[in-house]
């Protein structure tokens, strides 16, 4: 506490001097640059330590999964913003990131929260199938969509899910959260009477939980990864522009019925 009774400000992330930068206890120049991957650096920032080899493989896998998904609303928003403000690449990326909502890329935290809260205090031998059934029943009773299920494009199967779970299994990180997510998918499918396949955000929410990440930061995984993809969209916009064409066509087609013939 300070003399005025206020809590002293404190950060454990990094510090620097005129000739040194230290991040989470590691000298940036000597220990990290040229020695760790971008994914490992992100893990270090979030967890306060470098990952083990299995953790590195799994964390990098979920980050790679979230970098790119084509011409999504966030990518279009980034391109259009760059058209209007080419002096502000960071503004265009930010515009795209603001589009990472519950439909595209964002709800990793919803899935992680559902899983972490469902298993909070549960004993090691807990009946996961019973927990899954209870989660689905509660979500449906509240009129909510079950997090981590369904996709507007990948109707029958999200091809990223089996590969993510395979990587997790190969690295010893396919545990209760992954098993519960799969059981929730099965229970939701039975309750709905139609297929509700797991999507990538559900898989990533489960794997992030296996890695011990709190659900509150799990949407940040999508933010970090998709920023890379959005920079690539802006680079492509410089090489193969489409934003101006999108603007022109929307302007013409949306008001076509109002124009005199």
What residue spans do the PLM features occupy?
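Non-transmembrane, aqueous-exposed alpha-helical and coiled segments at domain scale
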Residues: 1-261
């Amino acid at each position: 506490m300070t003399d005025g009774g206020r809590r002293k400000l404190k950060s454990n992330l990094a510090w620097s001097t005129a000739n040194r930068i230290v991040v989470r206890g590691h000298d940036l120049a000597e220990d990290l640059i040229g020695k760790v991957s971008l994914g490992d650096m992100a893990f270090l920032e979030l967890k306060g330590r470098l990952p083990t080899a299995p953790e590195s493989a799994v964390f990098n896998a979920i980050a790679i999964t979230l970098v790119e998904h084509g011409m999504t609303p966030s990518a279009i928003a980034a391109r259009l913003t760059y058209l209007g403000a080419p002096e502000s690449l960071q503004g265009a990326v930010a515009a795209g990131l603001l589009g990472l909502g519950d439909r595209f890329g964002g709800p990793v935290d919803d899935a992680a929260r559902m899983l972490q809260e469902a298993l909070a205090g549960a004993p090691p031998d807990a009946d996961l199938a019973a927990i899954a059934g209870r989660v689905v029943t509660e979500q449906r009773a509240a009129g909510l969509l079950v997090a981590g299920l369904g996709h507007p494009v990948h109707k029958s199967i999200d091809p990223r899910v089996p590969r993510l779970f395979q990587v997790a299994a190969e690295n010893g990180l396919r545990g209760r959260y992954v098993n519960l997510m799969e059981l929730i998918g099965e229970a939701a499918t039975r309750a709905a009477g139609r297929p509700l396949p797991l999507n990538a955000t559900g898989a990533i929410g489960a794997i992030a939980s296996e890695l011990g990440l709190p659900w509150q930061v799990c949407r940040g995984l999508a933010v970090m990864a998709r920023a890379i993809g959005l920079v690539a969209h802006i680079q492509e916009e410089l090489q193969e522009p489409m934003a101006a064409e999108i603007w022109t066509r929307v302007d013409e087609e949306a008001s076509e019925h109002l124009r005199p013939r």
